[in-house]
Regions:
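N-terminal assembly/transducer modules of large multi-domain enzymes
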Residues: 2-132
């Protein structure tokens, strides 16, 4: 039994479907927002929107008790909170780290679709890059 079956067994089917619909849309929009963090004219809007995306993922996955997702989303949300205090675009290491984070969340979406166990978080994602 995979993650989708676990959720369907413990929560109303409509709640699970709504989560997956919204989660899928957030995953689809992440990459372009991350890349836009390196553009001066797009930085503020992108960092604020990414913060909102990870906050929403953290909240929804917390409600559904998807612990690895909640923990990683919280970790990224904290990093984005630091980035929100800045005015200049981020460096390449930060963009690459966030793209790797996005890949992890996309892998989890595939795990949901295929009703597999959630893929383990890559250790490298838990090492925050230099945000300067």
């Amino acid at each position: 039994m995979g993650i989708r079956s676990d959720l369907n067994a413990n929560f109303d089917y409509e709640i699970v479907d709504e989560f997956l619909d919204h989660y899928s849309m957030m995953i689809d929009s992440m990459e372009i927002m991350i890349i836009d963090l390196s553009k001066p004219n797009m930085y503020r809007r992108s960092v604020d929107e990414l913060f909102r995306v990870f906050h929403n993922i953290k909240s929804a996955s917390g409600f559904l008790k998807i612990e690895p997702m909640t923990r990683l989303a919280s970790f990224v949300e904290e990093a984005l909170e630091e980035l929100r205090k800045r005015t200049k675009p981020v460096n390449e290491n930060t963009v690459n780290w966030l793209l790797s984070v996005s890949d992890m969340f996309a892998q989890w979406l595939n795990d949901f679709k295929q009703d597999k166990e959630l893929t383990h978080v890559k250790y490298s994602l838990l090492k925050l890059p230099d945000l300067e």
